[in-house]
C-alpha cells in the first residue's frame, strides 16, 4: 500500500523531495508532549494558509499529512503547524520488550511537495526495579557438601535496558561465613548468581540457614529487589567409592596421537543400588589445560589423549579424578594420575637478550663496549638442547659474513661468558656519519637430528653528540587570518627539525620578545611550545593592523648546551567586509538630499555625483552605484563606478516636476553591505548657467575635489596670514604698553609730540636725578629690584632714564649702579604697587626706580627751597584728571579694560611714585594723615590741563632766595606723612673716625648720597672743570660711536650688539669703578674716583646701545662697574657738563637711528 501511495504522489507532484528526520523522546512522557517541529527541523518553506489551499482536487485538511505511522495510538502530527507530539504515555518496556533499541517511524507529506521520513527513538528511563519470580528460594544441601560446591540461584529480571538494567547481586545475613556468592555472566550479557559453600556444614550444629539475595540495577538512583534463601542441611550417605591406588604414573611420548589411552581407572563402592553405582569425573579443581589435553569416560574411568602434548610446555602432567556413587548425599573418592612426557627434538633454540644500552650507543664508544647480554636456550633436553651461537656478519663464536655494514659486516662480536650466556660487544670504533643504525642478528643451532636453527635480530642506533641545531623547514612562515577573529583561534604552525636523537632532538618553541608599536608581541600571539602551533590572543582589525612579524625560537634539549635557531613569522590580516558604505555626497539629512535641475537641461546633464566611502579594502571596498527605485520613467541614469547621475530626458512641461530617486551603494564583499539614499530632484524654471554645456550622451566634467582642495588651501593661507598679522600687532602694542610710564605720557599727545613719529628735543629738564636708597619702613610691602648678585650685595643702586616718546622701548638709556636691595612702598599706595615684586628693570617699575641717581660727596649744594607741605600736597593730586597719563594706556584708547590704570577713581601711580622718591631717612618716624588734596596743583597751567601734566606740575616749588641759609638739606625737603619740623642730623660716614659731616664731591671720605629733588641747584655749582674735561676726544674716535654703529646698522635694531656676548661689560670695564671701591673702607683709594664727561657719555652710550639686552647681560655690566684699574680721582667734573653731554648723546642717537629708538 505504501508503494502505491508513493507512486500516486510521484505522479501527482513530480517535484517531490525526501527528507529524513530523527527524534528522541524519553519514555513515560504524558500525552501532548511536543517532540519536534517538522517544518522548522526540515527547513521547509511555509505552505499556503488553509483558506487558500484547495482547488485542483487537493485536500484542504492541512499542510502536513501522515502517510504511514507505526504507532498511531502513540504519535501524531498537527496538520497545520507540523508539530510532532505524543497522544498518550509511552512505555518502552511494553512497546519494545525484547529489543534494547526502541524506535518508531512515521512518513509525513508536507506542503504537497516534501516527504519526511521520521524516526522517533524511545529512550529508556530507570522506571522499573529488578524483580524475582518468587519471594523465597528453598534449597537442600547435604552436610557433607565439600567447600567450593556451587549451587545456581534464581536470577532477577529488570525490564529496563542498558545502564538501567540489572547490574549485580549481593548476599547478606551470612553471620558465620559459610556461604559465598559468585556473579557470572552469560553470553548475552545477562548476569546470574551462584551460591558457593565456603566452609563445611554441620547439620548437628545448625540444620537451617536463612540468607537474603539482593539484585541491583545501574540506574541513578539504583533500584533493587530482594529474595530470601532458605537452606536446609540434609544428612549424607555413609559409604563412598574407593580406588585401587591413590596415585598412578604413566609415561607418554610428547608426539602421541589423539585418542591414545593413557590409563583405565577402577573404583568400587560397598553400598548397593544407586548408593553403590560409581561415576568418574575430573575433580573440580583440575586445570582447564588438563581438561583440554585429556578426557575421561564417566562410567568406565578410561582416560584418553584429547589434545597435542608438548614436553617443552609441561613435561609432567597431573590429573585428579573423583568417583562418586548415586546415593543421597554422596561423598566422592579421589586419585591422582601423573603423566610423564618423553622429549622429542621438536623445538628450535630460543634466543633472548637484554640490551645494556637500550638500543642506542654513542659513536664515541670505544671498542669492547658491551651492547647487550644474550641468553640462548632450547626447550629440548639432552643432545637436542646443546647449542652453538654466533653473530651474523660479525666476529665471535662461529663468526662469518653477514649484513648490516660496509662489506656485509657489522662492528660487533659475540663473547661467551658462561653456559648459554653471551655478551655482544663492539670490535672497532663506530662512525655515525657512516651509518647511524645497525641490525644485529644472532644465530643459534641445537645438536638434535636433524638440527634446528633460530635467529634473533635487534637494532642498535648510534647516538650523535648534540652538534646540530634545530632547523626550520622555512625561513619565513606566512600565516593569514581574517579580521574580527576569535581570540584563541589557530593561525598555523611552524616546524623545526633536529637531526639529533633523544633530548638533543627534542625541540621546544617560544616567541622572541618584540613589540608592535608600544605593545608587546605576547599580547598578540602565542605558540604551543610542543608542536609549534600559533594561536591568536586578540581579535585583529585589518583597518588598524594589516600585517605584523615576529620571530619564533626553536631550541633543543641537548646537553651540555642547548642549540637554537629562529624563523620569522609574518601574519597577514585579511580584510573582512565589516564596514558598510557611507554616503558623503551629496549631504544627506535623514538619508535624504534635495537637488535642482533646470527644465532646459539637455540629455546627459550632470545632476549630481553620489560619493560614498568604505573603510574596507580590495573587493570589500569597491563600490557600485545603482538606482533602485523612483526611475520608472528612465529619466536618469547613474554611473555604476563614479556615481554620476545624469539626465536621460529633457525636462519638458509634461515631466513630473519632482522625482524621488532611491540610490543604493553596494560593495563587493562577502556578504555584501550597502547604503541607501533618497534624492529628491526638482525641476526649476530658468536656463542653464553660462558655461554649463548641454551634452547629448556622455558629458565630460571636472572633478570637484580639485577646486575644493584649492579653496580650502586659499582659506587656510588667508587665515594664517591674518593670525600672523594680528600676533605681530598685538606683540608690538604689548611691548609699547610694557614700556609705558607716566613720566613720558605727555609725549603721546599730538600737540606735544607733534605726531606719532615726531621726536621731542631733550633738554636738561628732562633728566631727573634722585636718590634711590631709602630705609625700609614696612617689611610687608617690599619690592625687590635686584637682578644679580652684584646688585644684591652693593650698597647703592643707580638708575638713569630719560623721558622718551611712547614708541621708544623701555629703558633705552639707563645706567645701573648697585643700590639698596629693597625699595619700600608706602602702604597708602598699595593699590598701585603692593601686589608686585620684581627683579631688575621690570616693566612695572615705578617712576621712582627709573629716576636717575648720581653719587655726590660733600657737594656744595645751593639752597633748594621747597614749598610748604600744603603746596606739595596740592601738587601731588594733579594726575587724577581723567585724561591723565597712564602707566598702561598709550593715549590712543588701546588699553585693556581690565587694567587698573583706567580707573579714574584710583590714585595716580605717578603721584605714588613721587612720594616714594621723596621718602628719606629721618629721625622722627611719627606720621599724621594727609590733608584733603585740592583738585589742581599750583604749578599747573592751562596748557597742561588740556594736553597733560609734565614734571613741573608735580615737582616742588622753588621758594624765595632768602631761605637759602638753611644748610641742612633735609630742611629743604618735604616728605608726605612726615612731620615738618625735621631734626637736623647728618649721616655717618664709612670712615672709622666717625666724623659726621658731608664730604665734598670727589673727596676721600664718602657718605650717603643726598636726595636731590631738582637738578637745577646743582647745575649751578661753581666747580671748575678739570683740564681733562677740556680735551674731549672727537666723536669719530670715541668708543661710544664704535659701540653705537654696529647696533644701528643691524636692520635698524639694537639687537645687533647681541652678536658679541659680553661686549657691554668689556666696554664698560674701561671706565667704571668696581663695587670694592665703595664697599670696603680699607680698599678705598686715597683720592675719590671721578669720571670725565666724555667718559660718562661713552658709558651711557654703551648702555643705550645695549638697552635691549637681557638682565644677565646687564648683570655683567654691573660687575664691571667696579673695575680696580680705574684711576680717575685726578679728574673733576661739572654736573652741568655731564647733563649736557648726555643730552647731546641722546639727541645724536635718536637722529641717527630712529628705528632703533622706536623699537
UniProtKB/Swiss-Prot annotation:
Cystine bridges: none
Topology within the bilayer: Single-pass type I membrane protein
PROSITE patterns noted in UniProt: CADHERIN_1, CADHERIN_2
InterPro entries: Cadherin-like_dom, Cadherin-like_sf, Cadherin_CS, Cadherin_N, Protocadherin/Cadherin-CA
Motif (Cell attachment site): 186-188
Entry GO terms, CC: GABA-ergic synapse; glutamatergic synapse; plasma membrane; postsynaptic membrane; presynaptic membrane
CDD domains: Cadherin_repeat (cd11304)
Top-level lineage group: Eukaryota
Keyword Phosphoprotein in annotation: no
Role noted for this protein: Potential calcium-dependent cell-adhesion protein.
UniProt protein name: Protocadherin-17
Amino acid at each position: 500500500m505504501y508503494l502505491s501511495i508513493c507512486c500516486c504522489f510521484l505522479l501527482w507532484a513530480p517535484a517531490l523531495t525526501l527528507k529524513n528526520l530523527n527524534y528522541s523522546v524519553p519514555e513515560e512522557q504524558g500525552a501532548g508532549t511536543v517532540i519536534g517541529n517538522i517544518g522548522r527541523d526540515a527547513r521547509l518553506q511555509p505552505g499556503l494558509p488553509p483558506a487558500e489551499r484547495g482547488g485542483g482536487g487537493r485536500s484542504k485538511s492541512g499542510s502536513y499529512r501522515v502517510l504511514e505511522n507505526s504507532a498511531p495510538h502513540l504519535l501524531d502530527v498537527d496538520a497545520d503547524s507540523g508539530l510532532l507530539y505524543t497522544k498518550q504515555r509511552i512505555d518502552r518496556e511494553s512497546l519494545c520488550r525484547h529489543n534494547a533499541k526502541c524506535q518508531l517511524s512515521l512518513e509525513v507529506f508536507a506542503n504537497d511537495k516534501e516527504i519526511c521520513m521520521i524516526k522517533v527513538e524511545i529512550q529508556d528511563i530507570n522506571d522499573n526495579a529488578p524483580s524475582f519470580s518468587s519471594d523465597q528460594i528453598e534449597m537442600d544441601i547435604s552436610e557433607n557438601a565439600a567447600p567450593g560446591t556451587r549451587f545456581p540461584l534464581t536470577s532477577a529480571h529488570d525490564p529496563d535496558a542498558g545502564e538501567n538494567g540489572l547490574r549485580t547481586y549481593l548476599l547478606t545475613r551470612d553471620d558465620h561465613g559459610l556461604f559465598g556468592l559468585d556473579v557470572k555472566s552469560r553470553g548475552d550479557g545477562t548476569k546470574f548468581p551462584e551460591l558457593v559453600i565456603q566452609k563445611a556444614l554441620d547439620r548437628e550444629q545448625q540444620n537451617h540457614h536463612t540468607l537474603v539475595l539482593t539484585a541491583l540495577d545501574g540506574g541513578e538512583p539504583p533500584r533493587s529487589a530482594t529474595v530470601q534463601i532458605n537452606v536446609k542441611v540434609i544428612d549424607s550417605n555413609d559409604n563412598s567409592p574407593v580406588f585401587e591406588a591413590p596415585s598412578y604414573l604413566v609415561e607418554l611420548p610428547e608426539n602421541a596421537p589423539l585418542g591414545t589411552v593413557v590409563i583405565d581407572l577402577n573404583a568400587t563402592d560397598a553400598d548397593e543400588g544407586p548408593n553403590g553405582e560409581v561415576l568418574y569425573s575430573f575433580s573440580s579443581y583440575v586445570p582447564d589445560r588438563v581438561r583440554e589435553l585429556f578426557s575421561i569416560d564417566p562410567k568406565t574411568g578410561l582416560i584418553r589423549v584429547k589434545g597435542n602434548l608438548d614436553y617443552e610446555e609441561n613435561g609432567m602432567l597431573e590429573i585428579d579424578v573423583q568417583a562418586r556413587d548415586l546415593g543421597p548425599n554422596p561423598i566422592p573418592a579421589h586419585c591422582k594420575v601423573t603423566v610423564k612426557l618423553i622429549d622429542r627434538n621438536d623445538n628450535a633454540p630460543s634466543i633472548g637478550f637484554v640490551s645494556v644500552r637500550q638500543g642506542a650507543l654513542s659513536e664515541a664508544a670505544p671498542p669492547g663496549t658491551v651492547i647487550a647480554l644474550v641468553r640462548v636456550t632450547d626447550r629440548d633436553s639432552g643432545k637436542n638442547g646443546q647449542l652453538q651461537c654466533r653473530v651474523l656478519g660479525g666476529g665471535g663464536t662461529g663468526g662469518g659474513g653477514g649484513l648490516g655494514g660496509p662489506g656485509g659486516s657489522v662492528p660487533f662480536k659475540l663473547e661467551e661468558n658462561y653456559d648459554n650466556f653471551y655478551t655482544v660487544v663492539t670490535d672497532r670504533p663506530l662512525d655515525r656519519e657512516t651509518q647511524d643504525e645497525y641490525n644485529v642478528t644472532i644465530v643459534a643451532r641445537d645438536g638434535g637430528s636433524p638440527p634446528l636453527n633460530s635467529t634473533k635480530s635487534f637494532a642498535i642506533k648510534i647516538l650523535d653528540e648534540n652538534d646540530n641545531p634545530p632547523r626550520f623547514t622555512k625561513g619565513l612562515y606566512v600565516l593569514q587570518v581574517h579580521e574580527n577573529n576569535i581570540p584563541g583561534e589557530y593561525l598555523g604552525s611552524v616546524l623545526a627539525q633536529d637531526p639529533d636523537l633523544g633530548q638533543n632532538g627534542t625541540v621546544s618553541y617560544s616567541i622572541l620578545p618584540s613589540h608592535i608599536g608600544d605593545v608587546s608581541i605576547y599580547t598578540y600571539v602565542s605558540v604551543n611550545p610542543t608542536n609549534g602551533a600559533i594561536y591568536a590572543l586578540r581579535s585583529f582589525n585589518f583597518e588598524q593592523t594589516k600585517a605584523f612579524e615576529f620571530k619564533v625560537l626553536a631550541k633543543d634539549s641537548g646537553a651540555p648546551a642547548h642549540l637554537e635557531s629562529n624563523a620569522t613569522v609574518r601574519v597577514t590580516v585579511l580584510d573582512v567586509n565589516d564596514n558598510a558604505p557611507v554616503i558623503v555626497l551629496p549631504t544627506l539629512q535623514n538619508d535624504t538630499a534635495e537637488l535642482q535641475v533646470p527644465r532646459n537641461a539637455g540629455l546627459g546633464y550632470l545632476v549630481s555625483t553620489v560619493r560614498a566611502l568604505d573603510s574596507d579594502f580590495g573587493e570589500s571596498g569597491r563600490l557600485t552605484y545603482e538606482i533602485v527605485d523612483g526611475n520608472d520613467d528612465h529619466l536618469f541614469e547613474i554611473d555604476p563606478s563614479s556615481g554620476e547621475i545624469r539626465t536621460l530626458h529633457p525636462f519638458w512641461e509634461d515631466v513630473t516636476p519632482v522625482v524621488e530617486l532611491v540610490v543604493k551603494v553596494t560593495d563587493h564583499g562577502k556578504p555584501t553591505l550597502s547604503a541607501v539614499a533618497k534624492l529628491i530632484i526638482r525641476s526649476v524654471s530658468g536656463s542653464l548657467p553660462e558655461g554649463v554645456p548641454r551634452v547629448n550622451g556622455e558629458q565630460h566634467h571636472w572633478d570637484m575635489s580639485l577646486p575644493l582642495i584649492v579653496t580650502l588651501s586659499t582659506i587656510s593661507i588667508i587665515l594664517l596670514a591674518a593670525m600672523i598679522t594680528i600676533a605681530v600687532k598685538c606683540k608690538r602694542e604689548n611691548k609699547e604698553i610694557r614700556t609705558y610710564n607716566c613720566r613720558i605720557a605727555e609725549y603721546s599727545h599730538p600737540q606735544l609730540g607733534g605726531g606719532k613719529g615726531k621726536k621731542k628735543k631733550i633738554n636738561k629738564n628732562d633728566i631727573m636725578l634722585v636718590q634711590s636708597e631709602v630705609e625700609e619702613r614696612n617689611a610687608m610691602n617690599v619690592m625687590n629690584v635686584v637682578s644679580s648678585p652684584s646688585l644684591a650685595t652693593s650698597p647703592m643702586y643707580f638708575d638713569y632714564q630719560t623721558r622718551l616718546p611712547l614708541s621708544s622701548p623701555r629703558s633705552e638709556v639707563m645706567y645701573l649702579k648697585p643700590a639698596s636691595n629693597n625699595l619700600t612702598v608706602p602702604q597708602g599706595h598699595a593699590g598701585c604697587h603692593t601686589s608686585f615684586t620684581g627683579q631688575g628693570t621690570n616693566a612695572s617699575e615705578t617712576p621712582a626706580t627709573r629716576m636717575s641717581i648720581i653719587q655726590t660727596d660733600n657737594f656744595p649744594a645751593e639752597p633748594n627751597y621747597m614749598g610748604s607741605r600744603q603746596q606739595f600736597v596740592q601738587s601731588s593730586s594733579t594726575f587724577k584728571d581723567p585724561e591723565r597719563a597712564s602707566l598702561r594706556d598709550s593715549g590712543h584708547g588701546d588699553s585693556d579694560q581690565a587694567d587698573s590704570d583706567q580707573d579714574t577713581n584710583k590714585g595716580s601711580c605717578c603721584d605714588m611714585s613721587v612720594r616714594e622718591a621723596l621718602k628719606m631717612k629721618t629721625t622722627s618716624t611719627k606720621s599724621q594723615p594727609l590733608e584733603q588734596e585740592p583738585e589742581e596743583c599750583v604749578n599747573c597751567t592751562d596748557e597742561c590741563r588740556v594736553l597733560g601734566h609734565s614734571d613741573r606740575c608735580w615737582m616742588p616749588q622753588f621758594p624765595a632766595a632768602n631761605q637759602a641759609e638753611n644748610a641742612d638739606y633735609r630742611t629743604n625737603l618735604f616728605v608726605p606723612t612726615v612731620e615738618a619740623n625735621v631734626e637736623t642730623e647728618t649721616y655717618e660716614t664709612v670712615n672709622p673716625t666717625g666724623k659726621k659731616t658731608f664730604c665734598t664731591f670727589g673727596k676721600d671720605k664718602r657718605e650717603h648720597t643726598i636726595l636731590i629733588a631738582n637738578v637745577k641747584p646743582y647745575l649751578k655749582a661753581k666747580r671748575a672743570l678739570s683740564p681733562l674735561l677740556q680735551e674731549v676726544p672727537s666723536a669719530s674716535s670715541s668708543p661710544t660711536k664704535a659701540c653705537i654703529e654696529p647696533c644701528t646698522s643691524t636692520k635698524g635694531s639694537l639687537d645687533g650688539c647681541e652678536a658679541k656676548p659680553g661686549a657691554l661689560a668689556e666696554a664698560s670695564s674701561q671706565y667704571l669703578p668696581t663695587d670694592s671701591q665703595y664697599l670696603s673702607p680699607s680698599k678705598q683709594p686715597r683720592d675719590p674716583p671721578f669720571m670725565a664727561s666724555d667718559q660718562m657719555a661713552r658709558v651711557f652710550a654703551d648702555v643705550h646701545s645695549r638697552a635691549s639686552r637681557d638682565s644677565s647681560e646687564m648683570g655683567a655690566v654691573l660687575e664691571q662697574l667696579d673695575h680696580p684699574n680705574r684711576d680717575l680721582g685726578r679728574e673733576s667734573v661739572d654736573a652741568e657738563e655731564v647733563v649736557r653731554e648726555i643730552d647731546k648723546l641722546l639727541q645724536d642717537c635718536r637722529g641717527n637711528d630712529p628705528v632703533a629708538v622706536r623699537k
